[in-house]
Amino acid sequence: GTDMENIQGELEKVFCYALERDTITKEDIDAVCVTQITNHIFEMVDAVAAGNQQKALDLYYELLALKEPPMRILFLLVRQYRILFHVKALANQGYGRKEIASKAGLHPFVAGKNMEQAKRFKMGQLRRVMEEGAQLEQDVKTGLLTDNLAVELFIVKQSER
């Protein structure tokens, strides 16, 4: 739906949740409103890059609580690393934020955030992470791993570096 429809839906949920009370708290909103999944994914990659395994796992469990399928989370995580790989490759070629945004199909602000995040990784690391993500996806499809375990393994392994 549209943003206004989403806002209206979220407001309705908050009103129903706090029905018996006169005031709505931030905790009420946090308890019922859908958080932006892409923000969680970006924060997870940040936590992984910083070696903060617990924070990355906490964010993953929050996404699961929001009924986000594990395979979608894995796809989005690998996609974020792919974006970082592309952004870092362009930056290494001497391109600036605006050119990177244009070439990578990103908003300039988003390109800037990705450029900062990409600095925390080496090109080889990013390539390896993408390959490992693809392998885990294959392991789930062939029944070697459950989807949930695959994502947990991905987060744990990447945050140990």
Where are each of the predicted segments found?
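Conserved beta/loop motifs at nucleotide-recognition and modification sites
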Residues: G1-R161
